[in-house]
């Protein structure tokens, strides 16, 4: 997994480009999509989790699959 701070910066850039409302709390990101429940991104020891109301997704690194899944949740 990339450095956590680098990963958070990369995700923040992506969210800014997509005009998403979000807040960073330590190693967690909360995303507030319009008319949907909060989405959380959590950085654990060896994985990155995207947690939505419906499901949790785990990734070992930030890649196209990560951003594709995130995009489907925020739009």
Region locations from a protein language model:
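Negatively charged, low-complexity tracts enriched in Asp/Glu with abundant Ser/Thr
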Residues: 1-29, 53-68
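Short intrinsically disordered terminal tails
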Residues: 1-2, 73-75
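Acidic, low-complexity, intrinsically disordered interaction modules
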Residues: 32-58
């Amino acid at each position: 997994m990339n450095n956590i701070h680098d990963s958070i910066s990369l995700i923040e850039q992506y969210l800014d480009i997509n005009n998403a409302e979000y807040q960073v709390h330590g190693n967690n990101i909360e995303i507030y999509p319009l008319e949907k429940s909060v989405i959380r991104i959590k950085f654990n020891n060896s994985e990155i989790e995207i947690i939505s109301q419906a499901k949790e997704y785990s990734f070992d690194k930030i890649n196209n699959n990560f951003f594709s899944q995130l995009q489907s949740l925020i739009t």
